[in-house]
Amino acid sequence: MYIIRCICLWMILGLMACSGPVRIQKNLEVKPEIFPDYVDVTIPPNIAPLNFKLKDACVEARAILECGPEKLEIKTGKDACFVIPASGWKRLLRAASGNHLNVTVQAFVNDEWIAYAPFIIKVAKEPVDGWLAYRLIEPGYELWNRMGIYQRNLENYTENAIIENKMSGNNCMNCHSFCMQNPEKMLFHMRETYSCTLLIDGDKVEKLNTKTDQTLSPLVYPSWHPSGKYVAFSVNKTKQAFHMNDRNRVEVFDSASDVVV
């Protein structure tokens, strides 16, 4: 029991030692290189915490985010990944709406604390739409047997599936589109197994066979009329070609195309 108490005491003392201010021995004139690069960007006031990583190697690091009286300090180890708590982030954004955050990154490198030149993150007054829909697929050119269409809450990064292709024979699905950003009215295509276009209007779901003798292909790229009564589609005969030397390896081109409504 005595040993356990001693260990706990040392842990508490260690945490107290880490939580105090650090003595900066060198101030740099360069801004930190971080990933993703949020230096001097503009963000909406309702975006989820923008976690980031310091690219430079270090033993430990700190990030100080400030706006007026609101201040948030995040500490990290040698991985230099800053994970921003949601509650503190929301307070900062409320204070910085229409203004900006000041961000200072400090790092312990070569047995001394250095401070990078501060940078700002501008905060707009206008909020962003809360949800984003996208297709998620492994990077590459040929493999597509695992994919899905997902939606993500941009205010907290919660993600859930609209549909995954494990429900439809691991086929390809693509070109999802909403009418005027209305989640109640959307469409997307299924390829290979269960080939069709699915049209969703509220609780009504229609499966459409869109290949005819008069068109080049099934429907491809959509564009909604604002009324939601019409959709213009391209029909295409597409091919892929691969470059041997260029870093942009794949080239997609049309051999023929048309537009239908």
Regions found by a protein language model. Name each.
Residues 180-182, 226-227:
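Residue-level detector of Asp-centered blade-edge/turn motifs that repeat once per structural unit
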Residues 163-170, 210-216:
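Surface loop/turn motifs at the tips and blade-to-blade linkers of beta-strand repeat domains
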Residues 132, 185-186, 228-231:
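Hydrophobic beta-strand positions that form the internal "hydrophobic ladder"
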Residues 130-143, 199, 233-256:
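Short, conserved, GDST-rich strand-edge loop motifs in beta-rich repeat architectures
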Residues 34, 113-141, 214-215:
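Low-complexity, Pro/Ser/Thr- and charge-rich linker/hinge segments at domain boundaries
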Residues 149-153, 200-203, 250-261:
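Beta-propeller blade signature
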Residues 16-17:
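C-terminal motif of bacterial Sec signal peptides marking the signal peptidase cleavage site
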Residues 51, 175-177, 221-223:
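Conserved beta-strand position repeated once per blade in WD40 beta-propeller domains
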